A protein has these predicted regions:
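C-terminal catalytic domain of photolyase/cryptochrome flavoproteins
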Residues: 1-129
């Protein structure tokens, strides 16, 4: 996984206008959800569909934003669903993300396992992305 404190230190080191009292809660609490929901009401995770809607992040990308488990599937898709599955106990009661859990429940077991296997493979090979 990621080390939220290392990311926090990185932000402080590269941005001349980064003030710890602002940057620490934003990095650890909001963007990393590393405080378990003390500051943010939901984790900031997204699939390719959301990233594509919010900007031109997918334009020119070698990954297919509509695919989930193929070799050219956008990594964000499998990682998104696997994140929610991995954190079901912590997050499933949160009304702000209930729709994600309802969608996850409707998926066929084989489709879910393919997503989770893809996510495990992605995390094991991050340097190859």
């Amino acid at each position: 996984g990621l080390n939220p404190n290392a990311l926090h230190q990185w932000y402080l080191g590269i941005y001349i206008d980064a003030f710890e009292w602002v940057e620490l809660p934003n990095t650890v609490g909001m963007s990393q959800f590393a405080d378990g929901g003390g500051l943010a009401t939901k984790p900031y995770v997204s699939s390719a569909a959301y990233l594509d809607r919010m900007g031109d992040h997918c334009a020119g990308c070698r990954y297919d934003k509509k695919q989930k488990t193929t070799a050219d599937a956008c990594p964000f898709n499998a990682l998104y669903w696997e994140f929610y599955d991995r954190h079901t106990r912590l997050l499933s009661h949160n009304p702000r993300i209930g729709m994600a859990y309802r969608q996850l429940e409707k998926m066929q077991p084989e489709a879910k396992e393919a997503l989770f296997e893809k996510a495990r493979s992605l995390r094991a090979n991050l340097n190859a992305l």
